Amino acid sequence: MANTKKTTLDITGMTCAACSNRIEKKLNKLDDVNAQVNLTTEKATVEYNPDQHDVQEFINTIQHLGYGVAVETVELDITGMTCAACSSRIEKVLNKMDGVQNATVNLTTEQAKVDYYPEETDADKLVTRIQKLGYDASIKDNNKDQTSRKAEALQHKLIKLIISAVLSLPLLMLMFVHLFNMHIPALFTNPWFQFILATPVQFIIGWQFYVGAYKNLRNGGANMDVLVAVGTSAAYFYSIYEMVRWLNGSTTQPHLYFETSAVLITLILFGKYLEARAKSQTTNALGELLSLQAKEARILKDGNEVMIPLNEVHVGDTLIVKPGEKIPVDGKIIKGMTAIDESMLTGESIPVEKNVDDTVIGSTMNKNGTITMTATKVGGDTALANIIKVVEEAQSSKAPIQRLADIISGYFVPIVVGIALLTFIVWITLVTPGTFEPALVASISVLVIACPCALGLATPTSIMVGTGRAAENGILFKGGEFVERTHQIDTIVLDKTGTITNGRPVVTDYHGDNQTLQLLATAEKDSEHPLAEAIVNYAKEKQLTLTETTTFKAVPGHGIEATIDHHHILVGNRKLMADNDISLPKHISDDLTYYERDGKTAMLIAVNYSLTGIIAVADTVKDHAKDAIKQLHDMGIEVAMLTGDNKNTAQAIAKQVGIDTVIADILPEEKAAQIAKLQQQGKKVAMVGDGVNDAPALVKADIGIAIGTGTEVAIEAADITILGGDLMLIPKAIYASKATIRNIRQNLFWAFGYNIAGIPIAALGLLAPWVAGAAMALSSVSVVTNALRLKKMRLEPRRKDA
């Protein structure tokens, strides 16, 4: 190969030499490619002809074989974007770079998230490429206070606006002269006076528009800056032309438009200031989450208590937390007992009792006891840090509904410039032949009324506010895509254990005396069965003292047999009693049947071969489960239960909570197949689960919803995480999705409708340029303001027929 290039790719998923050989063989089948795959280093070195192949082709080949190529993710702060055309252009350029897998740019947050292959490119190259487009970019510093930076930028915008307004106000009075025949001092109509006021507004205050326009045009793009610069420059320089004619004596009554250019810039700055202020409110939810973190921790060093900054705490450090203080990091109690307010995580206001060996979560509040704890997770690994990360990613992500706006934004400015030019030609040749001023005014109005900003802000602002509001209620969407997909759900499948039920068996019914219960609990205390644990806990709640067993024997499939203090104990089913010639009275037999039909595990107790009691144990239904399912039904959503339990138990639980469809006796590996069956019927399915065995079904479903009290595997596989275990958050999540998508549609309707209606009206000469400019400035503000309504969203689902 004469013209060759070499690249190295990090490969994931290889387990043996067969894997590396397979990848190497497949790559070498490509023309003019020489590939070597090393299993030990997990790298593929590929020499190729760049005229025939690119790196993405090799990546696709590897992924098609079922392996992965390692990617890194970087978040970038970008300043200088003024409208959707800017963010769309940056995104398009980044996605065309070698080594970039995917890039998204968010106009609202002024950030980019880029997934890239580290062997092909790096973060510095990404920053440099953005800077070449004329924008400032830097790698996001998570330790930097973003709030103060944005506050400073907002203050700078306000100062520029005030200066511009002070200079433009006298010029604005000239407009009232034309509109209302007002009398004003002659000074205000003096061309020199107008020139002196308008020039600093045009070239000092408005210099940012020229810089932005130049950088965009130099790189083959066009944005809002181009429209503003061209429109205001046309008015300003035509006024200069008229002023020169006046100085030469060619005219005694110059037609000046200094007020148009200056007032336009002021109005646009006013709109941008309002927009920035409104956008800063969209991130309030994230700020509130960050404010939950403790600032310091009390560490135990050499027997002394020392206060240190939170970022200096390491895994394994011994910390002391006193009443009224926040738990600094995630950890485990090694001394003391207390009650902890975990409402920030679970929404449950009642404090949770904590003892030695119990886990505690950072940023929760220690209520009434001093505890000593060991730090197990710190920094970015804590529960709160992971919640913040999910919210950040959701707020910076894109929903598919935004694609149309992104496509249009890329062509918007050139089309508007073309329409403005056509407007000028039509006016000067057909409407007012040979008359320059009306043609100029109409074309300027077209330029300044067009607003690509509203298009770019319509979706991301709603996503930011909607996901933030959901997070405040304990609902974590992992991205805008999932917000959009959730509103289409018409079927919800709930796992039973740990989702509908608490996942912890408890004693629901007991008939017998305390001595029988004491002997029963003593017999069961050495058993590892979860039902035994429930019985022991029940006895402890009754403050009964447990003794020791003399003998203990499990009777497989039937129960247990034990000897305690010369008492012979039998605990089990009918068969165990029959085998030991113990008869059942009819009322006991009826009770046993009743409990079993109700989905409970019922056990008979015999002491010294005489029946002395009956006890029933069951996994109880969660509080509000019935209410949550009723709300889902009211929303027109079908609810089904999926479980590995037998049909009788499953139907008993389903009857309690109001579920009609029960899919029982399902093996864990069959859950995903059951979801697929529902999807084949044309249903949009959400799966709700909490266990490791739910993960495949969560992935298979259109939307996977993990209960936050569940396993990390389930949470990782899900698209939405419900903090705590409250099922009422499921209908709230669906309503939040519907409300957010409805808000996005309102924004897009306004953004498209405004431009579709506004541009023709301006072209017909029905709007003065300053009115058009005011409309443009306020259009994006209206979109952001509408999105901010979601902050007050009450997550109360509506009936489908409401």
UniProtKB/Swiss-Prot annotation:
A biological process from GO: copper ion homeostasis
Subcellular location field: Cell membrane
Binding site for Cu(+) 1: C16, C19
GO cellular component: plasma membrane
Gene3D superfamilies with a match to the protein in the record: 3.30.70.100, Calcium-transporting ATPase, cytoplasmic domain N (3.40.1110.10), Calcium-transporting ATPase, cytoplasmic transduction domain A (2.70.150.10), HAD superfamily/HAD-like (3.40.50.1000)
Binding sites annotated in the UniProt record for Mg(2+): D690, D694
Protein keywords: ATP-binding, Cell membrane, Copper, Copper transport, Ion transport, Magnesium, Membrane, Metal-binding, Nucleotide-binding, Phosphoprotein, Repeat, Translocase, Transmembrane, Transmembrane helix, Transport
Domain HMA: 5-70, 72-138
PROSITE patterns (alphabetical): ATPASE_E1_E2, HMA_1, HMA_2
Entry-linked CDD domains: HMA, P-type_ATPase_Cu-like
Database matches in InterPro entries: ATPase_P-typ_cyto_dom_N, ATPase_P-typ_P_site, ATPase_P-typ_TM_dom_sf, ATPase_P-typ_transduc_dom_A_sf, HAD-like_sf, HAD_sf, Heavy-metal-associated_CS, HMA_Cu_ion-bd
Reaction catalysis annotation: Cu(+)(in) + ATP + H2O = Cu(+)(out) + ADP + phosphate + H(+)
EC number assigned by the record: 7.2.2.8
Broad class of enzyme this protein falls into: translocase
Pfam family, one: HMA
Binding of Cu(+) 2, residues: C83, C86
Membrane topology listed for this record: Multi-pass membrane protein
A GO term for molecular function: P-type monovalent copper transporter activity
Active site, renumbered: D495
Residues annotated as transmembrane: 161-181, 192-212, 224-244, 256-276, 411-431, 438-458, 748-767, 771-790
Primary role: Involved in copper export.
Protein family per UniProt: Belongs to the cation transport ATPase (P-type) (TC 3.A.3) family. Type IB subfamily.
The name this protein goes by in its record: Copper-exporting P-type ATPase
Organism: Staphylococcus aureus (strain MSSA476)
